[in-house]
């Protein structure tokens, strides 16, 4: 009986650890998806004319990016050692092998956002803002994002 309890407890602890790791991976994925919604679903689509220019939506997207980018370092503190089930992209193990370099990619994105915040007034200025921000995001994605599918 004692042995059975030990085995069951060990299995439950192991399952709990796996679930906790998946939860961390999901939090990381959700943060990156939120940024993608702001940058690509709103800003990029406006710059391409896929959706009409909307000053309020553009300002909200920039504000959301600013908030989300500030969360990156903390959200990626822990390596979940697994990817989100059925995710298209995931974080490379390089994030945690070279955390200082990963973290150093965040301030340039924040600076790009700060430089355009409050200065977007039309599609042309939105295009310039998109390019400035996306170029900084790409600097990190080239090294630290993996295509899973």
Swiss-Prot record:
It is found in: Periplasm. Binds 1 heme c group covalently per subunit. Gene3D superfamilies: Cytochrome c/b562. Keywords: Electron transport, Heme, Iron, Metal-binding, Periplasm, Signal, Transport. GO terms for biological process: electron transport chain. Residues 1-20 form the signal peptide. The keyword Nucleotide-binding does not apply. Low-spin monoheme cytochrome. This is Cytochrome c-555. The gene is cycC.
């Amino acid at each position: 009986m004692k042995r059975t309890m030990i085995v069951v407890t060990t299995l439950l602890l192991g399952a709990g650890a796996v679930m906790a790791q998946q939860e961390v991976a999901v939090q990381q994925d959700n943060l990156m998806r939120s940024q993608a919604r702001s940058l690509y679903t709103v800003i990029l689509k406006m710059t391409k004319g896929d959706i009409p220019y909307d000053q309020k939506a553009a300002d909200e997207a920039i504000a959301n990016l600013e908030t989300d980018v500030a969360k990156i370092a903390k959200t990626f503190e822990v390596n979940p050692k697994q990817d989100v089930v059925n995710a298209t992209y995931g974080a490379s193990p390089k994030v945690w092998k070279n955390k200082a370099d990963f973290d150093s990619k965040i301030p340039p994105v924040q600076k790009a956002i700060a430089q355009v915040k409050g200065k977007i007034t039309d599609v042309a200025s939105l295009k310039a803002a998109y390019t400035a921000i996306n170029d900084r995001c790409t600097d990190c994605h080239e090294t630290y994002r993996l295509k899973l599918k």
